[in-house]
C-alpha cells in the first residue's frame, strides 16, 4: 500500500498541506505535490530519504481533459534503498512554469531543457534554459496537444543538422 511507504509517511509528516494525492499502481508509488513546494520536497527526498538519482523529468499535456493543463513528472530512485518514487506537480496553462530541480539533481538540467523545448514548460531559475532538440528558430512546442499535426507553416530548415 502506498500509505505504508516510508517516503510517503515522511512526506506527509513534513509537507502535509503540499501532498495533494498518493497512488500506487503495479507497485510504483506516485505522489502529487503542490508546484510551489517542489524544490523543498525534492531536496528533502534527496537529503533525508536518499533519493539520490533523478532518472527522468517529463510532462503530460491534458488539454481539455483536466486542470491544471500540464503535469510535470519526476522519476526518482534511491540507490541505497533500491526504491523508486514518482513525483508529479500540476502546472496551469496561464502560468506555465515551475521551479527547477537542477539545483537538487544535476541530472535534471538537460531533462528540464527537453521538457521546455517540446512542451513549453518554463523552469524558473534554470541555469541554461534554452532549446535542446529543436532548432533555435523553431516556433512553438511540438509535443503540446494544440500543436498543428503537420507542423507550423515555415520554410524547411537550411542549416547544418550534424
Curated annotation (Swiss-Prot):
It catalyses: a quinone + NADH + 5 H(+)(in) = a quinol + NAD(+) + 4 H(+)(out). This is NADH-quinone oxidoreductase subunit C. It is found in: Cell inner membrane. The keyword Methyltransferase does not apply. The keyword Cell membrane applies. Pfam families: Complex1_30kDa. It is a peripheral membrane protein. GO terms for molecular function: NADH dehydrogenase (ubiquinone) activity; NADH:ubiquinone reductase (non-electrogenic) activity; quinone binding. Its EC number is 7.1.1.-. NDH-1 shuttles electrons from NADH, via FMN and iron-sulfur (Fe-S) centers, to quinones in the respiratory chain. The immediate electron acceptor for the enzyme in this species is believed to be ubiquinone. Couples the redox reaction to proton translocation (for every two electrons transferred, four hydrogen ions are translocated across the cytoplasmic membrane), and thus conserves the redox energy in a proton gradient. Belongs to the complex I 30 kDa subunit family. It comes from Geobacter sulfurreducens (strain ATCC 51573 / DSM 12127 / PCA). NDH-1 is composed of 14 different subunits. Subunits NuoB, C, D, E, F, and G constitute the peripheral sector of the complex. One of its GO terms (cellular component) is plasma membrane. Keywords: Cell inner membrane, Cell membrane, Membrane, NAD, Quinone, Translocase, Transport, Ubiquinone.
Amino acid at each position: 500500500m502506498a500509505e505504508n511507504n516510508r517516503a510517503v509517511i515522511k512526506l506527509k509528516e513534513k509537507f502535509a498541506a503540499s501532498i495533494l494525492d498518493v497512488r500506487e499502481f503495479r507497485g510504483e508509488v506516485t505522489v502529487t505535490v503542490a508546484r510551489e513546494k517542489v524544490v523543498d520536497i525534492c531536496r528533502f527526498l534527496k537529503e533525508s530519504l536518499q533519493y539520490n538519482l533523478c532518472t527522468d523529468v517529463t510532462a503530460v499535456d491534458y488539454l481539455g481533459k483536466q486542470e491544471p493543463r500540464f503535469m510535470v513528472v519526476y522519476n526518482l530512485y534511491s540507490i541505497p534503498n533500491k526504491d523508486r518514487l514518482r513525483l508529479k506537480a500540476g502546472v496551469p496553462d496561464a502560468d506555465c512554469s515551475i521551479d527547477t530541480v537542477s539545483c537538487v539533481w544535476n541530472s535534471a538540467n538537460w531533462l528540464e531543457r527537453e521538457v521546455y523545448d517540446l512542451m513549453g514548460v518554463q523552469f524558473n531559475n534554470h541555469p541554461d534554459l534554452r532549446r535542446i532538440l529543436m532548432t533555435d528558430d523553431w516556433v512553438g512546442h511540438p509535443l503540446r496537444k494544440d500543436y498543428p499535426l503537420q507542423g507550423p507553416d515555415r520554410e524547411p530548415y537550411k542549416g547544418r543538422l550534424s
